[in-house]
Design a protein with these regions (language model features):
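C-terminal ends and interior cores of transmembrane alpha-helices
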Residues: 1, 187-209
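Hydrophobic core of transmembrane alpha-helices in multi-pass small-molecule transporters
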Residues: 1-13, 205-230
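Intracellular juxtamembrane helix-capping segments at the cytosolic ends
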Residues: 12-26, 229-243
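Intracellular loop-helix junctions on the cytosolic face of multi-pass helical membrane proteins
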Residues: 27-31, 47, 52-145, 167-175, ...
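Loop-to-transmembrane helix entry/capping segments in MFS-fold secondary transporters
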Residues: 27-37, 146, 214, 236, ...
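Glycine-rich segments within core transmembrane alpha-helices of 12-TM secondary carriers
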Residues: 31-57, 69-75, 153-157, 252-266
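A membrane-interface helix-boundary motif in multi-pass transporters
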Residues: 54-70, 177-180, 211-212, 271-290
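Transmembrane alpha-helices of Major Facilitator/SLC transporters
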Residues: 145-174, 185-193
Length: 311
């Protein structure tokens, strides 16, 4: 029941909130809007790893879940009291004026769904294989500072918070097309998995007691966090901008379903964690992530056309 309630609540909340963000801004401002939205999401997740791990170790699971309950209970009155602040712009203002047909725009979104599945399959390893690697194969101190496995979850959020303004400034100074940002994201995702494949080989053959430096995980998390900023908020923005108004909800739902499918694939791949060597496991993820790059490249002309080669 707990997981079912959690899944239902997240489905109702996250999908509608994401669509609401798109309705509040014109197409030209949505990339920046979703980047700020994504920044806020990670601001909320930053203390969870540290606080959850500390509460569990000192007071047990019941204390950690109680704090979650209190935090979520506060969201309801806040949302109710601030509901009048949201003023979606009129439908005719949000409608795209690209020359591309509705069919082209829908086909572009559908063509990006497999890329989303592959990316999030690798991305959500942070909650499964990477956490297990942190627990069983990584030293728990760095320069005398203790690092618990749950702390890496907060590290990822902290990296997103820190890198968002940096990447915004970089792309403002050196403009990059949407297509190229997606390609960069998938390339960094593949490189992140490759780093963990190398770390696994070090753990197996050269490191004492099979434990490696936390710097391996930190490097991998840094790469996947930058990749996340190039793919995830941009994906929401793309769907919001390209969706014909009458299909906007459906197509945003399909994008969310692709994310969920990637998460599901993470669980299925987790079966291989105990059956394969860790190096082979992360090698598989490296190959899967890299396979999305030619898939994106094959769609580059249509993607540029429907976006008007937006930069």
């Amino acid at each position: 029941p707990c997981v079912a309630l959690l899944a239902t609540g997240v489905g109702l909340f996250k999908g509608n909130l994401t669509a609401l963000v798109g309705s509040l801004f014109p197409p030209t401002e949505r990339d920046a809007a979703y980047s700020r939205f994504y920044w806020a999401v990670n601001l909320g997740s930053l203390p969870s790893g540290f606080a959850g791990g500390w509460l569990h170790s000192h007071y047990g699971f019941h204390a950690a879940f109680l704090v979650c309950f209190v935090a979520m209970a506060l969201v309801v009155p806040i949302g109710f009291l601030t509901r009048s602040l949201f003023h979606p712009i009129h439908q005719h203002e949000t409608e795209s004026h690209h020359a591309a047909s509705e069919r082209d725009r829908i086909a572009t979104i559908l063509g990006l769904l497999p890329v989303a599945v592959v990316f999030f399959c690798a991305f959500y390893q942070s909650g499964s294989s990477l956490t297990l690697f942190a627990k069983n194969n990584t030293r728990d101190t760095l320069m005398g500072i203790a690092i618990s496995p749950p702390a890496y979850q907060s590290l990822q959020a902290a990296l997103v918070l820190g890198m968002t303004p940096v990447l915004t400034r970089i792309f403002r100074r050196w403009p990059c097309s949407t297509r190229n940002k997606l390609l960069i994201g998938m390339g960094l995702c593949s490189l992140s998995c490759f780093v963990m494949s190398d770390a696994s080989m070090v753990s197996s053959f050269w490191s004492n007691h099979g434990r490696v430096s936390p710097l391996w995980l930190i490097s991998s998390y840094t790469l996947i966090s930058i990749a996340e900023l190039c793919v995830s908020p941009l994906g929401f923005s793309l769907v919001s901008k390209l969706s014909p108004p009458k299909f906007a909800g459906l197509l945003m739902g399909l994008w969310m379903a692709a994310i969920a499918l990637g998460n599901l694939a993470t669980g299925f791949l987790g079966i291989l964690w105990e059956r394969w060597s860790h190096a082979a496991f992360f090698g598989l993820l490296t190959g899967l992530s890299a396979s999305a790059i030619p898939l994106l490249w094959a769609q580059r002309q249509r993607l540029d056309r429907v976006l008007g080669v937006q930069r």
